[in-house]
C-alpha cells in the first residue's frame, strides 16, 4: 500500500482549466464510488475548491497507476489526457503526507495562511467518511493533518495578520473601534469582496448591517445569509448618518458617496466619528471626504500597504510552520511503516495460536482416552517446542548454508539469542 496525492491548482493551471476538472458538491459521492471501483484503489478523498482539485488515495503498488488515474479523471470530466497532463502534480508517500499537511495548514493556498481551506479539507474528509471511502491509513492521515493545522495556527503567527482586502478592511475597523458589537455598518456593493467583508463582520457580531446595491435581488441573497437590511444606492444619502463604518466596493465609474453627503451625515450624527473604507477602483468615495473632521477615509492603497506588511509577517511565520509540517510528516511515516510490523506480528501470533490449539486438542483427546497425564504433558511440551522452532531453524540453516553472515546475525537478534 502507498499513499498518493494528485491534483491541479492555481499554481499549475488557469481557471479556464480548473473549472473543467472541478467536482460539484452534488457529484462527490458518485465520484468517490467510481474512483474506488478502479483497480487497486483502496481508499480515496476528493478535495475540490475554486483554487484546487485534488485526489488523496491509498493504492496498491502498480507500475501504471499514473496512467490509470489520469484516464479515470479525463473520462469522468470528458477531457483529453493532453489537456491536463502537464498541469497535474503527483506526490507519493512522505511527499503526499506533507502536501496534505501543507494544504490543510494554508501553506499551499493562494492567500498564504488563509483559514478557509481547513474547513474545506474537513468537509472533503467527511464526505469520504459518509461514503465509507476511507482506508485506515487515509483516515489516520487526515486526522493527523487536522491536528497539524491546529498546531500551525496556535504555535505560529501564520493567521494573525490580514492579507486580503476584505479581511484587511475588517481588521482596520477592529483596530479603530474598541468593539464592533455596538456599531452599525453600511456596505456598498454586493460583489465577492463585500460578501467576504459581510461574513467577517457577522463573525464579529456587529449590531446592524445595511447593504446598499444597485439591484436589490443580488444584495438580498447576501443579506439573508448575514442578517442584514437591504437598500438601493439612491437611499444611501438618507441612511448614511446611521452608519459608524462604511465599506464600499462597486464597479461604478463615478463616486457614489460625495463630500457633501458625508458632511450632512456628520452634522446629523453631531460629529460622531465615521470610518470610511473605499476598496473600489475607480473610487466610490470622493477623496475630499478624508479632509473632513471626524471622517476617517482609507483607500485600497492604504489597505495594500497593510497587506504587504502583514504578508511579510506571514512568510516569516510560514518558515516555522514548514518545520512543524516536516517533523509531523516524518512522525506519520514512522507510524505508517510500523503498520507493516503490526500485520506481521498479528500473523505470527495467529500462527503460533493455531499450533497451540492443535497440540492442545491432541493432548486433551489423549487424556480423554486414558493416557497418562504426565506423559501427555511431556509430549505436548516437546511437540509444541519442535513446531514453534521449526520455521526459525530452517531460516538459520539456510542463512548458514548460504554463508549469509548478516542475515544470520539478524535472525539471532530477532530470536534474542545474544541477550543472555
UniProtKB/Swiss-Prot annotation:
PROSITE patterns with a match to the protein in the record: GLUTR
Pathway: Porphyrin-containing compound metabolism; protoporphyrin-IX biosynthesis; 5-aminolevulinate from L-glutamyl-tRNA(Glu): step 1/2
Gene Ontology molecular function, alphabetical: glutamyl-tRNA reductase activity; NADP binding
High-level lineage: Bacteria, Pseudomonadati, Pseudomonadota, Gammaproteobacteria, Enterobacterales
Organism this protein belongs to: Serratia proteamaculans (strain 568)
Enzyme category, top tier: oxidoreductase
Name of the protein: Glutamyl-tRNA reductase
Note: During catalysis, the active site Cys acts as a nucleophile attacking the alpha-carbonyl group of tRNA-bound glutamate with the formation of a thioester intermediate between enzyme and glutamate, and the concomitant release of tRNA(Glu). The thioester intermediate is finally reduced by direct hydride transfer from NADPH, to form the product GSA.
CDD domains: NAD_bind_Glutamyl_tRNA_reduct
Gene name of this polypeptide: hemA
EC code: 1.2.1.70
Amino acid at each position: 500500500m502507498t499513499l498518493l496525492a494528485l491534483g491541479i491548482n492555481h499554481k499549475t493551471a488557469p481557471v479556464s482549466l480548473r473549472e473543467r476538472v472541478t467536482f460539484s458538491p452534488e457529484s462527490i459521492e458518485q465520484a468517490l464510488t467510481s474512483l474506488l471501483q478502479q483497480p487497486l484503489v483502496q481508499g480515496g478523498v476528493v478535495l475540490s475548491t475554486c483554487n484546487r482539485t485534488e485526489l488523496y488515495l491509498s493504492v496498491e503498488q502498480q507500475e501504471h497507476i499514473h496512467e490509470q488515474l489520469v484516464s479515470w479523471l479525463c473520462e469522468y470530466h470528458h477531457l483529453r489526457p493532453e489537456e491536463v497532463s502537464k498541469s497535474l502534480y503527483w506526490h507519493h508517500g512522505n511527499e503526499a503526507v506533507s502536501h496534505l499537511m501543507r494544504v490543510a495548514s494554508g501553506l499551499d493556498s493562494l492567500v498564504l495562511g488563509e483559514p478557509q481551506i481547513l474547513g474545506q479539507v474537513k468537509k472533503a474528509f467527511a464526505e469520504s467518511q459518509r461514503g465509507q471511502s476511507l482506508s485506515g491509513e487515509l483516515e489516520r492521515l487526515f486526522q493527523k493533518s487536522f491536528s497539524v493545522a491546529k498546531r500551525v495556527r496556535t504555535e505560529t503567527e501564520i493567521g494573525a495578520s490580514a492579507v486580503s482586502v476584505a479581511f484587511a478592511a475588517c481588521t482596520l475597523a477592529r483596530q479603530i473601534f474598541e468593539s464592533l458589537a455596538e456599531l452599525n455598518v453600511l456596505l456598498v456593493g454586493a460583489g465577492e469582496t463585500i460578501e467576504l467583508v459581510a461574513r467577517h463582520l457577522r463573525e464579529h457580531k456587529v449590531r446592524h448591517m445595511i447593504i446598499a446595491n444597485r439591484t436589490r435581488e443580488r444584495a438580498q441573497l447576501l443579506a439573508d445569509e448575514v442578517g442584514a437590511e437591504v437598500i438601493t444606492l439612491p437611499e444611501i444619502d438618507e441612511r448614511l448618518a446611521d452608519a459608524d463604518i462604511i465599506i464600499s466596493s462597486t464597479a461604478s465609474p463615478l463616486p457614489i458617496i460625495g463630500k457633501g453627503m458625508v458632511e450632512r451625515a456628520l452634522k446629523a450624527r453631531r460629529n460622531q466619528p465615521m470610518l470610511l473604507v473605499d476598496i473600489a477602483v475607480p473610487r466610490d468615495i470622493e477623496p475630499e471626504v478624508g479632509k473632513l473632521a471626524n471622517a476617517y477615509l482609507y483607500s485600497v492603497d492604504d489597505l495594500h500597504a497593510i497587506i504587504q506588511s502583514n504578508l511579510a509577517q506571514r512568510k516569516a511565520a510560514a518558515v516555522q510552520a514548514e518545520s512543524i509540517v516536516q517533523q509531523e510528516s516524518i512522525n506519520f511515516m514512522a507510524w505508517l511503516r510500523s503498520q507493516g510490523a503490526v500485520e506481521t506480528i498479528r500473523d505470527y501470533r495467529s500462527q503460533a495460536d493455531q499450533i497451540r490449539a492443535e497440540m492442545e486438542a491432541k493432548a486433551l483427546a489423549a487424556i480423554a482416552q486414558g493416557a497418562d497425564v504426565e506423559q501427555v504433558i511431556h509430549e505436548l511440551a516437546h511437540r509444541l517446542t519442535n513446531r514453534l522452532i521449526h520455521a526459525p531453524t530452517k531460516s538459520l540453516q539456510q542463512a548458514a548454508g548460504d554463508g549469509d553472515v548478516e542475515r544470520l546475525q539478524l535472525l539471532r537478534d530477532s530470536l534474542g539469542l545474544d541477550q543472555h
